[in-house]
Amino acid sequence: MAAIPSSGSLVATHDYYRRRLGSTSSSSSCGSVDYSGEVIPHHPGLPKADPGHWWASFFFGKSTHPVMTTVSESPENSGSFRITNGLVPCGLTQESVQKQKVSDSKSNSSPSA
């Protein structure tokens, strides 16, 4: 069975991006044993972040919207859903939500026998 590499390989990749080569010579090889890199200083104008997750804010920025939307299935129709907090969940268009609201208001205003 193949062994799963430890996190050392990830650290090596990370160190590659945090260091720059001390030599600009084109004759140096990438696999050189005598690699001497220097740590690139942090720019004072940039915010410091966890180096393992600096990219997360680009994809998972802080949202002002709630993460979860409460959606309940209508007991009358097994295919219709009601949104309780006004947010549209993925896969539903604003048009379909408005149609649902119109049909709900019509069913609520109809006289009962």
UniProtKB/Swiss-Prot annotation:
One of its GO terms (biological process) is cell differentiation. Coiled coil: none annotated. It comes from the Eukaryota. InterPro entries: PPDPF. Keywords: Developmental protein, Differentiation. The keyword Transmembrane helix does not apply. It holds the Pfam family PPDFL. Belongs to the PPDPF family. Probable regulator of exocrine pancreas development. This is Pancreatic progenitor cell differentiation and proliferation factor A.
